[in-house]
């Protein structure tokens, strides 16, 4: 394990309880409908999983497709569970997605996996009450990079054909927190 992977795994372990296990009094009266570990790509079911979080008893909702960070080599969707509940409390259906970390998965595997997750969202919109006309794509750190890349892929036929992916969802907004971008 590289120092980089060790470092990001340590951050997740140190802050997991603080971020996800505290009693959240502001959510006590809310009834969440959370479905965990849904396989979005059966060819790699151990890695390609997502969670759906929303308020129980609500109709069609705008979607936040959220991608965790972790320095490209670490991280997990479960470390963003409290954030997903917070977004759900605001009236969103949250899709909290995992992808394969480097170096085990090499470019462009993560992009292809995340496009497959978007395909799952589109294919399951009726079942989970996703309003596909109102989709926000977001993430933190490496997840913000992947979210920005998905926005480029969704709007570029050449990138879609190079990756063998065809996300049909267009994003109405982006939620990018401390991502890594090459702006030059």
How would you label these PLM feature ranges?
Residues 1-26, 144-145, 174-175:
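N-terminal presequences and immediately downstream first alpha-helices
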Residues 12-59:
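N-terminal cap/lid segment of alpha/beta-hydrolase-fold proteins
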Residues 60-70:
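Short beta-strand element of the alpha/beta-hydrolase
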Residues 63, 88-95:
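A fold-wide structural signal in alpha/beta-hydrolase
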Residues 71, 100, 180:
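Catalytic metal-binding/acid-base residues of hydrolase active sites
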Residues 75-84, 95-132:
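Catalytic nucleophile-loop/oxyanion-hole region of alpha/beta-hydrolase
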Residues 119-184:
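Primarily recognizes the serine-hydrolase "nucleophile elbow" in alpha/beta-hydrolase
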């Amino acid at each position: 394990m590289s120092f980089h992977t060790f470092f990001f795994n340590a951050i997740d372990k140190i802050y997991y309880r603080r971020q996800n296990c505290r009693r959240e009094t502001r959510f006590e009266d809310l009834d969440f409908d959370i479905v965990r570990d849904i396989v979005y790509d059966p060819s790699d079911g151990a890695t390609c999983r997502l969670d759906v979080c929303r308020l129980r008893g609500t109709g069609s909702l705008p979607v936040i497709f959220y991608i965790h960070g972790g320095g490209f080599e670490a991280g997990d969707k479960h470390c963003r569970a409290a954030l997903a509940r917070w977004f759900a409390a605001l009236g969103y259906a949250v899709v909290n997605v995992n992808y394969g970390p480097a170096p085990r998965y090499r470019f462009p595997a993560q992009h292809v996996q995340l496009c497959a997750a978007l395909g799952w969202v589109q294919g399951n919109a009726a079942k989970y009450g996703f309003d596909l006309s109102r989709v926000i794509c977001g993430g933190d750190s490496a997840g913000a990079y992947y979210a920005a890349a998905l926005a480029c892929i969704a709007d570029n036929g050449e990138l879609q054909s190079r990756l063998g992916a065809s996300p049909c969802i267009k994003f109405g907004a982006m939620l990018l927190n401390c991502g890594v971008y090459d702006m030059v």
